[in-house]
Amino acid sequence: ETATKTVKAFRSEISKKHGTDSIFSVFIAVDEVPEKFEAISSGHFFYTPSKKGLGETHRSEMKSILENWSVNSKEEVLSWLDGFCKLSTYEISIPVLKDRDLAPQGKTGLIVSTLFEYDIVKKAYESGWYGELKEELEKRIIEVLSNSIYPILKDRILFSFSSSPLSIESYSG
């Protein structure tokens, strides 16, 4: 019985916590044959568009944005997001390259994920522009990939949707 109480107390305490790094994922449906993507990359890999990477500058800028959220404009946050997307590392998965039955004939689906700070998404939600942040992040990720590894991407997108750290939290609790 003591062990049960300890476990319940631990569960209660841990349920109030959250991590800092989480995942932002975008699914992109593309009107393009898988072979075009296969000529560029494998079905699963990590990609960083810039050798510079995020590094300490990014972390200090992000910390400043979070600490000054109430005085920063939305435009300042979105400007920071531009730099983030250009320097981030992406995990890219193209399931149809492993199994052609995983997409309609002549179509390709990409799953693109990157680490993303939970607190930024949470603050955007609390400020009333969570949906816009998701759309802007999705748009910037697609733009970065279109301007680098996948120039075929931009004009061939059928649809896309994303999940943020808050999406993950809502499903996992």
What are the functions of these language-model segments?
Residues E1-A103:
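Mid-domain catalytic core of redox enzymes
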Residues I23, I120-Y130:
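Glycine- and acidic
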Residues I28, V112, L145:
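Hydrophobic, well-ordered secondary-structure elements that form the walls
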Residues F84-P95, N147, P151-G173:
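A glycine-rich dinucleotide-binding beta-alpha-beta segment and adjacent secondary-structure elements
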Residues Q105-T114:
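Short coil-to-beta-strand
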Residues L115-D119:
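Short connector loops/turns at beta-strand edges and beta->alpha or beta->beta junctions
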Residues K134-L137:
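Activation-segment/catalytic-loop signature of the eukaryotic protein kinase fold
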Residues R140-V144:
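Short, well-ordered amphipathic alpha-helical segments that serve as non-catalytic structural scaffolds
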